[in-house]
């Protein structure tokens, strides 16, 4: 009898969790910004007055982009398209 109760409770939990899941469209509407602006080395000394010309890329810079900041992070790089 105890096993039957455990099975019923487990089934109820599975139904409750699956009913609360968001549909795929709602998942796509909740998006996280994948890129943000960052300060390249030649943007100026002050972060408040500098124009942020770089873009934060997770991992490393995309193909055709260059790393524009001298500092090193494991998770992301400050990158921009080559000038010219």
From Swiss-Prot:
Endpoints of the signal sequence: 1-19
Compartment list: Secreted; Nematocyst
Name listed for the protein in its UniProt record: Delta-stichotoxin-Sgt3a
Pfam families membership: Toxin_4
Record's keyword annotation contains Secreted: yes
Propeptide: 20-33, 84
GO cellular component: extracellular region; nematocyst
MF annotations from Gene Ontology: sodium channel regulator activity; toxin activity
Protein family: Belongs to the sea anemone sodium channel inhibitory toxin family. Type II subfamily.
Disulphide bond pairs: 38-78, 40-68, 61-79
Keyword Signal in record: yes
Origin species: Stichodactyla gigantea
Main localization category: secreted
Keywords: Cleavage on pair of basic residues, Disulfide bond, Ion channel impairing toxin, Nematocyst, Neurotoxin, Secreted, Signal, Toxin, Voltage-gated sodium channel impairing toxin
Function as written in the Swiss-Prot or TrEMBL entry: Binds specifically to voltage-gated sodium channels (Nav), thereby delaying their inactivation during signal transduction.
Lineage top rank: taxon: Eukaryota
């Amino acid at each position: 009898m105890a096993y039957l109760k455990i099975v019923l409770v487990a089934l109820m939990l599975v139904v409750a969790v699956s009913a609360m899941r968001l549909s795929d469209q709602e998942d796509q509407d909740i998006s996280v910004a994948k890129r943000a602006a960052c300060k390249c080395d030649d943007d100026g000394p002050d972060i408040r007055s500098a124009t942020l010309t770089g873009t934060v890329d997770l991992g490393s810079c995309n193909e055709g982009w260059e790393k524009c900041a001298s500092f090193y992070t494991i998770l992301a790089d400050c990158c921009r398209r080559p000038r010219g």
